Amino acid sequence: RVADFVAAHAADYDCIVTSQDWHIDPGSHFSDHPDFVDTWPPHGVAGTVEAELHPALAALHADITIHKGMYEAAYSAFDGEDVATKRPLLELLRNKGIDSLDVVGLAQSHCVCETALDGVKDGFKVRVFTDLTEPVSPELGELAAHRMTEAGVELVPSKD
């Protein structure tokens, strides 16, 4: 759904950004007994097929590709760096004159929420397209939706 939406609406955006976990040694983020809130089973391990973008997302040829969580837990795309330039997302968005963000993807309760909250904190107008994201659980999704709404994130369906 995400790749189809972005492909259909790419001309509406000045910049397309992808982000992905790229864990090298994320410390206590990985656990043999994860709580699925702060600790997780191994995932997004750098250099593995599982860490790669889905082929449909990779085919979008994003303007900025963010890797995050190399050496610690990092839910927000603002915590990572662009693969090509090694620059942080905030700097790259500012340099492009971007002032608003539409955030989609997985998981609404974690990475989407933290990226949206950081975007608002950094002065962007932020929307999350509710039909293009899913939480880890309904309960965590409700909590994330409340946090985002309270912070000024607009939660809306996409136009498709």
Labelled PLM ranges:
Residues P41-P42, E50-I64, P138-D160:
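Structural recognition of alpha->loop->beta junctions
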